[in-house]
């Protein structure tokens, strides 16, 4: 959806339809779409796109997102008339967030994002994964600062201000599921959008490499050239290790959950088998556990 929106003049039409399907498939995926939109605008500004054009693109993205959400909610109530009575995950209260809750929910998004990457990740997150996430954040800031200097973005105050604002919105975008589901415990939510932080870091490293290749004919000191590619290698290694540790953590967590569920099922099967083995037990009798 985001690709079509950025690539074609009338790409907003299929993009809107796709985003409606995205919401219908799994609401957590919308965070990825919002994050990709923001990341694309950040990259555009770094590459030299004018602020007014990026602002127009931003308004178009907001309009598409709002339209997709509204249509999705209407279709949800048509397809599932009893949706308002559904209690699972707070689905029945979808779209009923009070204005007074908005600042708190926005703060919740930033808090959970910072906790995951910097302060206090989940208990199952390993020390290696936490360290790599901290390094990813440091690299993101370092690469952004370098590109602002290299691209002379500090001379264009409108573009620089807008770029910093969009970077500030990035945590809100990738953690937007915390805003959408205020009644659900944070440990039960899926935050796929967090992976876009790694993608954004790699995108900035890619811009750096393109800039260096363009100026490769200019005489450079050896240490400068080595430090450049050393930065790229470090970025690639850190992002790879972060993704790999996330892969391990996720699979181990689901494996532990599967083992726990199997044990509970086996335990209750033994209890039921023991009850049914009683001489005076009749099929359909009420059983009370004390």
What kind of feature is each model-predicted range?
Residues 4-20, 49-59:
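Short hydrophobic alpha-helices at membrane interfaces in multi-pass membrane enzymes
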Residues 12-27, 32, 38:
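Membrane-interface alpha helices of multi-pass inner-membrane proteins
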Residues 33-66:
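Perimembrane helix-loop-helix junctions
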Residues 84-121:
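Luminal/periplasmic active-site loops of membrane-embedded glycosylation enzymes
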Residues 122, 126-158:
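Hydrophobic, aromatic-rich transmembrane alpha-helices
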Residues 165-210:
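Hydrophobic/aromatic-rich transmembrane helices and adjacent perimembrane loops
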Residues 209-248:
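Signature aromatic-anchored transmembrane alpha helix within multi-pass, membrane-resident enzymes
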Residues 238-290:
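Membrane-embedded, lumen/periplasm-facing catalytic core of multi-pass transferases
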């Amino acid at each position: 959806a985001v690709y079509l929106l950025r690539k074609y003049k009338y790409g907003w039409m299929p993009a809107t339809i796709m985003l409606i399907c995205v919401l219908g498939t799994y609401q957590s995926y919308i965070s990825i779409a919002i994050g990709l939109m923001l990341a694309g605008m950040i990259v555009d500004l770094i590459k030299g796109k004018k602020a007014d054009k990026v602002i127009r693109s931003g308004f178009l993205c907001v309009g598409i997102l709002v339209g997709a959400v509204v249509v999705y909610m209407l279709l949800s109530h048509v397809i599932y008339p009893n949706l308002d009575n559904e209690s699972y995950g707070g689905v029945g209260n979808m779209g009923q967030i009070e204005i007074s809750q908005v600042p708190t929910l926005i703060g919740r998004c930033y808090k959970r994002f910072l906790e995951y990457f910097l302060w206090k990740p989940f208990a199952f997150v390993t020390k290696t994964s936490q360290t790599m996430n901290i390094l990813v954040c440091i690299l993101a800031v370092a690469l952004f600062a370098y590109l602002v200097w290299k691209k002379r973005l500090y001379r264009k105050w409108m573009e620089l201000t807008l770029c910093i604002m969009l970077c500030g919105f990035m945590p809100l975008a990738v953690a937007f599921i915390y805003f959408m589901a205020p009644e659900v415990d944070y440990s039960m939510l899926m935050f796929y959008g967090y992976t876009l932080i790694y993608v954004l870091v790699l995108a900035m490293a890619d811009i750096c490499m393109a800039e260096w290749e363009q100026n490769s004919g200019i005489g450079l000191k050896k240490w400068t050239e080595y430090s450049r590619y050393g930065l790229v290698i470090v970025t690639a290694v850190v992002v790879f290790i972060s993704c790999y540790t996330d892969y391990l953590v996720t699979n181990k967590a689901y494996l532990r959950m599967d083992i726990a569920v199997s044990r509970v099922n086996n335990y209750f099967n033994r209890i039921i088998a023991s009850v049914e083995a009683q001489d005076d037990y009749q099929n359909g009798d009420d059983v009370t556990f004390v």
